[in-house]
UniProtKB/Swiss-Prot annotation:
Keywords: Cytoplasm, DNA damage, DNA recombination, DNA repair, DNA-binding. This is Holliday junction branch migration complex subunit RuvA. The gene is ruvA. One of its GO terms (cellular component) is Holliday junction helicase complex. CDD domains: UBA_RuvA_C. The keyword Transferase does not apply. InterPro entries: DNA_helicase_Holl-junc_RuvA_I, Hlx-hairpin-Hlx_DNA-bd_motif, NA-bd_OB-fold, RuvA, RuvA_2-like, RuvA_C, RuvA_C_sf. Residues 1-64 are annotated as: Domain I. Residues 144-148 are annotated as: Flexible linker.
Length: 199
């Protein structure tokens, strides 16, 4: 069971990265909370890993901190929440914000996340409220990144949000409200788009 990987960041996208560990490339799925903190491609990187084993596949999920990993594992421990949905939940809320929503029973905020209905939100609060109080969560730190072209940024954000469960037309509308500046990054535009979508 893989629990930690350390190597060189060979490729990154909002959905997954490829981590080069001594010449072997590992594809690791990540939430936005981890993506925001990644170094530039070629940089050194160490990720906490959760290994998901199924009959037909072995998937790796990576996190910059042990706390994020623990939160992910708490989420998938809730009935009806698999690794993909748990990653989506973390992608829509920073760990500290998610913890606050669970502790305070903010069902409206939780239900606004794609893939989570009212019943799932209620189940999350019921099962995780007390556990969240015991789990200290730090704000993710911003990581360095280069500034790609505006259209490339929009395309990456569009793809990432569609993969999270948002309708393309809804995402396009949100992106239309944003002004992508010359120094904009995928991380920044993702955060801004999510704020609009979560209204």
């Amino acid at each position: 069971m893989i629990a930690l990987l350390t190597g060189k960041l060979a490729y990154k996208s909002p959905e997954f990265i490829i981590l080069d560990v001594n010449g072997v490339g590992y594809q690791v799925h990540i939430p936005f909370s981890t993506y925001y903190t990644l170094p530039v491609e070629g940089g050194a990187l160490s990720l906490q890993i959760h290994t998901s084993v199924k009959e037909d596949a072995i998937n790796l999920y990576g996190f910059r901190t042990q706390q994020e990993k623990e939160l992910f594992q708490l989420l998938i421990g809730v009935s009806g929440v698999g690794p993909k949905l748990a990653t989506g939940i973390l992608s829509n809320s920073e760990p500290s914000e998610l913890a606050d929503s669970l502790v305070n029973g903010n069902l409206a905020r939780l239900s606004a996340i794609p893939g989570i209905g009212k019943k799932t939100a209620e189940r999350l609060v019921l099962e995780l409220k007390e556990k969240m109080k015991k789990l200290g969560l730090a704000q993710p730190q911003a990581g360095g990144t280069t500034a790609p072209a505006k259209q490339e940024i929009r395309d990456d954000v569009l793809s990432a949000l569609i993969n999270l469960g948002y309708k393309e037309a809804v995402v396009q509308k949100a992106l239309a409200e944003l002004k992508v500046t010359e120094d904009a990054t995928v991380e920044l535009v993702l955060k801004q788009a999510l704020k609009i979508l979560m209204k």
